[in-house]
Amino acid sequence: MASTSRLDALPRVTCPNHPDAILVEDYRAGDMICPECGLVVGDRVIDVGSEWRTFSNDKATKDPSRVGDSQNPLLSDGDLSTMIGKGTGAASFDEFGNSKYQNRRTMSSSDRAMMNAFKEITTMADRINLPRNIVDRTNNLFKQVYEQKSLKGRANDAIASACLYIACRQEGVPRTFKEICAVSRISKKEIGRCFKLILKALETSVDLITTGDFMSRFCSNLCLPKQVQMAATHIARKAVELDLVPGRSPISVAEAAIYMASQASAEKRTQKEIGDIAGVADVTIRQSYRLIYPRAPDLFPTDFKFDTPVDKLPQL
């Protein structure tokens, strides 16, 4: 809040001829230009983004930026911290010849913890191809939880994993606990515990997941044609409407529907293949399948083209 008020207090640069025009910033030239008349209103504009050139000993290091990372509004100081580069004099090395100052930062411990969590969140999101908006929402959730100190005693990695799970749910692209678990070092049970604690601490909620939330992705990963995906979606929806699967998770119902639809088509998939995609055991699929199998004739869409008749489907 303090940094925002300081920015608001600064005089606003405007074009004298067009005061309402939004100025265009040319960072290469360092100018601020009026788009209406082309007048250069301000010069020597400072670019607060990263400068991706290497200046430290003319060698490319892990982080080759000259002025550090771009501003991060989630950190207390916007991450405008000081970076101490490697020295060249004798005083820069200890008695064993090791550098004393290897990219040290004057950053608070809380900001350092959040930065580490943000990096872990980005890494996890990249592994399961999640877009940037999911990462941003996850970072915001983590910051709220961290500043409230409501989950003391829980590992930051576990909190970050749970925040990622919540962000996916809130953005309408849910992932399973096992999918999040697979890209983190945290157990499914611990992520689940943190998930419940975070919802309570932030007084927020997530929409209930449905079979449709996973159907498209599961079928795509199984390389199933559109007809099978549509049939599986129809089967799962009808099974829920007819109350055939009380107490079963939407994920297991979706997988059972995919198994039934694929077995009735020419593109058959085994229980193991389907289970591997969603991280669910074969027995879980079988339990849900057995519940919907007796009503199989009522579950398929009327225009479905059977390769295997309903009465020939596996009974398990």
Swiss-Prot record:
Keyword Iron: no
Protein location: Nucleus; Chromosome
Record keywords, A-Z: Acetylation, Acyltransferase, Chromosome, DNA-binding, Metal-binding, Nucleus, Phosphoprotein, Repeat, Transcription, Transcription regulation, Transferase, Zinc, Zinc-finger
Single GO MF annotation: RNA polymerase II general transcription initiation factor activity
Location of region: Core promoter DNA-binding: 189-193, 249-252, 283-286
Phosphoserine modifications at: S70, S76, S92
Post-translational modification: Acetylated. Autoacetylated; autoacetylation at Lys-238 stimulates transcription activation.
Reaction(s) catalysed by this chain's protein: L-lysyl-[protein] + acetyl-CoA = N(6)-acetyl-L-lysyl-[protein] + CoA + H(+)
Enzyme class at the top of the EC tree: transferase
InterPro entries: Cyclin-like_dom, Cyclin-like_sf, TFIIB, TFIIB_CS, TFIIB_cyclin, Znf_TFIIB
One matching Pfam family: Zn_Ribbon_TF
Positions annotated to bind Zn(2+): C15, H18, C34, C37
Function: General transcription factor that plays a role in transcription initiation by RNA polymerase II (Pol II). Involved in the pre-initiation complex (PIC) formation and Pol II recruitment at promoter DNA. Together with the TATA box-bound TBP forms the core initiation complex and provides a bridge between TBP and the Pol II-TFIIF complex. Released from the PIC early following the onset of transcription during the initiation and elongation transition and reassociates with TBP during the next transcription cycle. Associates with chromatin to core promoter-specific regions.
Oligomer and partners: Found in a ternary complex with TATA box-bound TBP. Part of a TFIID-containing RNA polymerase II pre-initiation complex (PIC) that is composed of TBP and at least GTF2A1, GTF2A2, GTF2E1, GTF2E2, GTF2F1, GTF2H2, GTF2H3, GTF2H4, GTF2H5, GTF2B, TCEA1, ERCC2, ERCC3, TAF1, TAF2, TAF3, TAF4, TAF5, TAF6, TAF7, TAF8, TAF9, TAF10, TAF11, TAF12 and TAF13. Associates with TFIID-TFIIA (DA complex) to form TFIID-TFIIA-TFIIB (DAB complex), which is then recognized by RNA polymerase II (Pol II). Found in a RNA polymerase II initiation complex.
Comment field on protein domains: The TFIIB-type zinc-binding domain is necessary for the interaction and recruitment of RNA polymerase II to the core promoter, the formation of a fully competent pre-initiation complex (PIC) assembly and basal transcription initiation. The C-terminus is necessary and sufficient for interaction with the TATA box-bound TBP complex and for the formation of PIC.
Stated name of the protein: Transcription initiation factor IIB
Organism, scientific name: Bos taurus (Bovine)
